[in-house]
Amino acid sequence: MACTMFTATFSASQEITRTFDIIWAIEAGLWNLRVAAKKFFEENPNADKKTAKEFLVKGLNVYGLNAKRIANELTWEYEEQYVAELLLTYGIGIFDSWVDGIVDTVLIHSSNNLKKKIKEDLKKGEFQTFESALSQEPLSALAGCFHVSPKRQNQHIDNLRLVYKYFKSCRNCCAHGNHQFTAICEANYNAIKTLTKEDCGINEFPKMVETKAGDPVKLILRGVVVFFDVLILKTILHLEILIADHNGALIISIL
């Protein structure tokens, strides 16, 4: 069991690292394309899309590239927002997959229907149903390490949970809504707008815009990047599970 849980947590951390490897490449490539396209059209204002593509992108069959739009019509803020949405959506997906693996592994005696409910709650940033089900599991050294009792409660975890809820609600507006902040987003923002990095135990607090229901969703890429630290911390906080069966120094060195 411990090996399976370790694998789930390690995989999530590795996936986050791989995501950044690609996201930074996309960000840098988009910026370089934008700069090169601006220069090209300044020197060749009447060039068509095919000519621009052949000049700007060599050795790659990219169909439908509208370099003029990248250079002159779309703002860098728009393009960066788009990358931020991709990063946020993928990051939430990593955490959701981790939740599925952990719940299925730890809650051996819970029904499938209960597990489904617990997964839904955890993915919303709500831990109560998980804690309740965990308390019903037969006691073991492993379960004892995992249970977040008042004595073992990390002082930052509730604030981290609230930050997660805010960004999850923003992601929902992008993935399932009309790209407008909802009342839920506004409420989640108000719950964390005065928090600091010290309140959350992180090196930097995620940057956010003032969030009001009905306003267009706006994400700050740097804020989404820092949010990934929250995802990682939320994962690492649960590594207490593994201490009974794995060397803690090994786990820390891997992460």
Say what each PLM segment does.
Residues 112-119, 171-174:
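Internal hydrophobic scaffold segments of catalytic domains
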Residues 119-169:
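A contiguous pocket-lining binding segment that forms or flanks enzyme active sites
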Residues 160-189:
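Histidine-centered, metal-coordinating catalytic motifs and their short helical/loop contexts
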Residues 1-116, 150-162, 186-255:
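Extended intrinsically disordered or low-complexity regions, especially N/C-terminal cytosolic tails and loops
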Residues 3, 145, 170-174, 185, ...:
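Generic recognition of cysteine residues
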